[in-house]
A protein has these predicted regions:
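Short glycine/proline-enriched turns and hinge-like loops at secondary-structure junctions
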Residues: 76-78, 146-149, 174-179, 194-197, ...
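A short, Trp-centered hydrophobic/proline-enriched beta-strand micro-motif
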Residues: 130-139, 183
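A short core secondary-structure module
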Residues: 160-161, 165-213
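Short, surface-exposed charged micro-motifs
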Residues: 152-154
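Flexible, small-/acidic-enriched active-site or ligand-binding loops
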Residues: 150, 208-237
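Alpha-helical interface subdomain recognition
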Residues: 1-92, 101, 114-119, 126-131, ...
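N-terminal glycine-rich flavin-associated loop
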Residues: 98-118, 147
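Short, solvent-exposed loop/turn elements at beta->coil junctions and helix N-caps
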Residues: 71, 139-143, 170-172, 216-220
């Protein structure tokens, strides 16, 4: 099992790291400072200029669409891409600059893997080119979304059209004017078996009946310009051919989508933790109290050591999960994905929280990125499945294995 940086990805990783440090980081603060109070989800002229210039430079340098692994994508495997995702996690803008930001990556993977040729032509091509953005409508306000089969939004076939009614919330990116299409999880057959009731349908955002109700704040922050929207769909009519893969395949598609996405999220989280540790060390060495640098006070050196050890453990677990995704079945990888989805956000939260504490009051202000980083990681404990559900998956699997092995041992003694 080789989890190291391969010869293929090593030079690419260095180029990505250099691009982020030399091109992205110097303008990131300016981009954030430009967010408009009156209309935070619309990019200002200066933000458009910054982002457009960075994306053009990245595309011309071949630093583009890394996430689409395998022969038809970047040629990277999941382990190799994981190292790039970690670097992107150190910057607020980097993932979008390289056209590797959620939810577009997951949507592009869905269209690449399951979409028809017409769907790929209409939506995948402009997404891969970075010309448009997209959103994914799954979570709903009226039901517990920790159960991925728990969908109320309905789609009824009337002639050659699907008629969609329902509400979605936490629809990330839906308020961005660049967002042109939603992949919407709907219920098409309430009488079918539980995992065959759902379908996924492409809904252009300018379709009559698609209404942005309001943005949802995260710890009273809008998370602009990306944002998370509540969306109402009232008698939304789209062509029959907008369904992806076919009726009843929605749950199957969502599982294929969420697995790689969770690995990407976790590696970016490790990048965030690395950035927080860097800021923590900077503060601990430059700031003095009682005549001594902070790292020489109390148990602060232990905090720094624990952060490094916890990051390394989480990285190794995530890389092994990426390896499982490359070399085993999705069913086998599923348990490992649940492990990292539980371990990594909680690890990152602890490191970021320790960095906040080391900074004192300024750590919770807008003068450092730490408060926003903490908010993002706390949200990730809920996004793509709450960690309580992932713990349940891991625990149940452990009991299942124990009982199977215990049964084999008992049978051996009984028969022997």
């Amino acid at each position: 099992m080789d989890l190291g940086i391969s010869e293929k990805v090593a030079p690419l990783l260095e180029r990505v790291r250099s691009f982020i440090n030399e091109q992205v980081m110097p303008v990131e603060h300016e981009f954030v400072a430009e967010i408009e109070v009156d209309d935070p989800f619309v990019l200002t002229d200066r933000q458009t200029e910054i982002l457009g210039s960075l994306k053009n430079q990245a595309r011309e340098a071949g630093l583009w669409n890394f996430f689409l692994t395998g022969e038809k994508g970047s040629g990277l495997n999941t382990v190799e891409y994981a190292y790039l995702a970690e670097e992107m996690g150190k910057s607020r803008l980097a993932a979008e600059v390289f056209n590797c930001s959620a939810p577009d990556t997951g949507n592009m993977e869905v269209l690449h893997k399951y979409g028809s040729e017409a769907q790929k032509k209409q939506w995948l091509e402009p997404l891969l080119a970075g010309e448009i953005r997209s959103c994914f409508g799954m979570t709903e306000p009226a039901v517990a979304s920790s159960d991925a089969t728990n969908i109320c939004t309905s789609a009824t076939l009337e002639g050659d059209e699907w008629v969609i009614n329902g509400e979605k919330h936490w629809t990330s990116g839906a308020g961005d004017p660049r967002c042109k299409v939603m992949i919407c999880m709907v219920k098409t057959d309430p009488e079918a078996p539980k995992h065959l009731q759902q379908s996924q349908i492409l809904v252009p955002m300018d379709t009559p009946g698609v209404n942005i109700v309001r943005p949802l704040k995260v710890f009273n922050m809008l998370d602009a310009p990306h944002g998370h929207m509540r969306v109402k769909l009232e008698n939304v009519r789209v062509p029959k051919d907008n369904i992806i893969l076919g009726p009843g395949r929605g749950f199957e598609i969502s599982q294929g989508r969420l697995g790689p996405g969770r690995i990407h999220h976790c590696m970016r989280s490790i990048g965030s933790a690395e950035k927080a540790l860097e800021l923590l060390c900077e503060r601990a060495t430059e700031r003095e109290a009682f005549g001594r640098p902070l790292y020489k006070l109390g148990g602060n050196i232990d905090i720094i050591a624990d952060a490094r050890m916890n990051i390394e453990q989480a990285r190794l677990l995530t890389l092994k999960t990426a390896w499982m995704m490359d070399h085993t079945s999705p069913k086998e990888a599923r348990i490992w994905i649940s492990m990292i989805k539980t371990v990594v956000p909680n690890m990152a939260l602890k490191v970021i929280d320790d960095a906040i504490q080391m900074h004192g009051g300024i750590g919770v202000s807008q003068d450092t990125p730490l408060a926003e980083m903490w908010s993002g990681q706390r949200t990730l404990r809920l996004a793509d499945g709450p960690d309580a559900v992932h713990r349940m998956v891991v625990g149940r699997n452990e009991i299942k294995q124990y009982l199977a092995e215990a049964g084999e041992v008992a049978a051996t003694f009984r028969d022997g």
